[in-house]
From Swiss-Prot:
Names of the cofactor(s): [2Fe-2S] cluster; Mg(2+)
Pathways involved: Amino-acid biosynthesis; L-isoleucine biosynthesis; L-isoleucine from 2-oxobutanoate: step 3/4; Amino-acid biosynthesis; L-valine biosynthesis; L-valine from pyruvate: step 3/4
Protein name (Swiss-Prot/TrEMBL): Dihydroxy-acid dehydratase
Species this protein is from: Rhodopseudomonas palustris (strain TIE-1)
Family, as annotated: Belongs to the IlvD/Edd family.
């Protein structure tokens, strides 16, 4: 039977000093035999998805104490990708994921915590904490701050549901008046919470449900709704139970690596494909799987993408459906239920709250459940009042959305498409693969071929789009923005949003070794691997070349002869130390970012650090 990790600091004569320090934090003699639970919070006033978390850590802590544990809270950093977008601040977003994972490891291992509750929400925070949970492999429960309510705006006498992306597109549209743009801006983000569509933050919080590490509703119940309080309360009780089961009952099934095993990662990716989640989730699932020492790869994602249908389209794939609508249709448990009925899930996987995923679906899938409390839970509605306060309203819809033929969530027989919402493409320009969010691609451009216009920074591409140098039929290539080449693998939300504002969202393609915001839609192909800075073929593309894209057949190719590419490769290598770097780009790269660039791997490997490779170890 494993001993509580915390005994290292709470037992024995030689730990008198450590116990003295624990006592100074408020612990008493009776506490030294209890599990010490880390409450990993991520409150910050910089991020709307985290601005309401300040008191929620202590809410969880009180419940842990009531259940017989000792709670100790600490905080991680949190970057707002939307505020960091469009300038060099975005270089720091993805690297912050590694810092978050490390900071959790440092605090938990330094103080020998026995288990943890991870209070996350936005883009890199949930993935960073997930990586830490898989790395540490101690009992863990995830609970997010929840999505914000969708904005509502009246334009020309008609009410529209809007979000951050709508405001960005409107601002770049010269046909929109300043007054209308300001109205959109003021309406786009009305409450606290993660941005209201199926962007990266909400995608990841939904995936923790499929992985079995969070409670039902974690990904969909609104930040402002009183029902979300129950998730925080239950997280406190649940983690103490899991800790006791492991340390006192010798039950290793409750550990993250045994819950989120290979089959659970397949379930999560299946959900991701079915709901058209953010392409960033591919990076994060690969990174978390690596921490869990699982051989889960792009090949597995490709395999799953060929058999999983698209069962839901949510903003940004469509403009009028947001997370509040997904919740009304039964949330993530409803999508998982439809996938199960289609034979696409392994429901034998365990969860932190149920013996198996199958048992969880029997209770929480609204097409199976007879529980009135479950149905009431999924009727939680937006309050429609601007608020930065958690649990500030308790409004409910009169009815659930149970329409599986034309509703927000479809069954497999009425899927939006037989192909899922994410796809992996391969070809000479992406030997290790690249990612496209097919749920956001118009059917008319699933196959596309056009002349290339090459840019070696996001800024140059944006300038070209806004000055009308990009025309219908063009393939925009932005390179040297990968994990190493950026460094930091910037999101390309501004270029894709500006293409929309110019009426080119269905007339152009954008290809990059960088990545895209969860708010991106259109023919946007990212994570091209190997990246230009690693000698990838994308580094040899020139203006006027043609690139052909065939999503149904999962191919992408640079239509240039092998002989010409060999010649270009020789010319590039002849640049010596400057080879495989941008020719004219001026960018200040800090020592912190240089360190990330030295250690990072390809997007095809999750853009994680590989210290062994750096120092020549096997």
């Amino acid at each position: 039977m494993p001993a509580y990790r915390s005994r290292t600091t709470t037992h024995g004569r030689n730990m008198a000093g450590a116990r003295g320090l624990w006592r100074a934090t408020g612990m008493k003699d009776s506490d030294f035999g209890k599990p010490i639970i880390a409450v990993v919070n991520s409150f910050t006033q910089f991020v709307p998805g985290h601005v309401h978390l300040k008191d929620l850590g202590q809410l969880v802590a009180r419940e842990i104490e009531a259940a017989g544990g000792v709670a100790k809270e600490f905080n991680t950093i949190a970057v707002d990708d939307g505020i960091a977008m469009g300038h060099d601040g975005m270089l720091y977003s993805l690297p912050s994921r590694e810092l978050i994972a490390d900071s959790v490891e440092y605090m938990v291992n330094a103080h020998c915590a026995d288990a943890m509750v991870c209070i996350s929400n936005c883009d890199k925070i949930t993935p960073g904490m997930l990586m830490a949970a898989m790395r540490l492999n101690i009992p863990a429960v995830f609970v997010s701050g929840g999505p914000m309510e969708a904005g509502k705006v009246v334009l020309k006498g008609k009410t529209h549901a809007v979000d951050l992306i709508d405001a960005m597109v409107a601002a770049a549209d010269s046909a929109m008046s300043d007054e209308d743009v300001q109205t959109m801006e003021r309406s786009a983000c009305p409450t606290c919470g993660s941005c209201s569509g199926m962007f990266t933050a909400n995608s990841m919080n939904c995936l923790t449900e499929a992985l079995g590490l969070s409670l039902p509703g974690n990904g969909s119940v609104l930040a402002t709704h009183s029902d979300r309080k129950r998730l925080f309360v239950e997280a406190g009780h649940t983690i103490v139970d899991l800790a006791r089961r492991y340390y006192e009952g010798d039950d290793a099934s409750v550990l993250p690596r045994n819950i989120a095993n290979f089959k659970a990662f397949e379930n999560a990716m299946t959900l991701d494909i079915a709901m058209g989640g953010s392409t960033n989730t591919v990076l994060h699932l690969l990174a978390a799987a690596r921490e869990a020492e699982l051989d889960f790869s792009m090949k597995d994602i490709d395999r799953l993408s060929r058999r999983v249908p698209c069962l839901s389209k949510i903003a940004p794939s469509v403009s009028d459906v947001h997370m509040e609508d997904v919740h009304r249709a039964g949330g993530i448990m409803a999508i998982l239920g439809e996938l199960d009925r289609a034979g696409l899930l392994d429901t034998s996987c365990t969860t932190v709250h149920s013996e198996t995923l199958g048992a969880a679906l029997a209770r929480w899938d609204i097409r199976q459940s007879n529980s009135e409390s479950v149905r009431t839970f999924f009727r939680a509605a937006p309050g429609g009042v601007p608020s930065q306060t958690a649990f500030s309203q308790d409004r409910r819809y009169d009815e659930l959305d149970l329409d599986r033929e034309k509703g927000v969530i479809r069954d497999a027989a009425h899927a939006f498409s037989k192909d899922g919402g994410l796809a992996v493409l391969y070809g000479n320009i992406a030997l290790d693969g690249c990612i496209v969010k097919t749920a956001g691609v118009d059917a008319s451009i699933l196959t596309f071929s056009g002349p290339v216009k090459v840019f070696e920074s996001q800024d140059d591409a944006v300038s070209a789009i806004l000055t009308n140098k990009i025309v219908a039929g063009d393939v925009v290539v932005i390179r040297y923005e990968g994990p190493r080449g950026g460094p930091g693998m910037q999101e390309m939300l501004y270029p894709t949003s500006y293409l929309k504002s110019k009426g080119l969202g269905k007339a152009c393609a954008l290809i990059t070794d960088g990545r895209f915001s969860g708010g991106t839609s259109g023919l946007s192909i990212g994570h091209v691997s190997p990246e230009a800075a690693e000698g990838g073929l994308i580094g040899l593309v020139r203006d006027g070349d043609r690139i052909s894209i065939d999503i149904p057949n999962r191919t992408i190719s640079l239509d240039v002869s092998e002989a010409e590419l060999a010649k270009r490769g020789e010319e590039e290598r002849a640049r010596g130390e400057a080879a495989w770097t941008p020719k004219d780009r001026k960018r200040n790269v800090s020592a912190a970012l240089q360190a990330y660039a030295m250690l990072t791997t390809s997007a095809a490997n999750g853009a994680v650090r590989d210290v062994k490779r750096r120092f020549g170890k096997n």
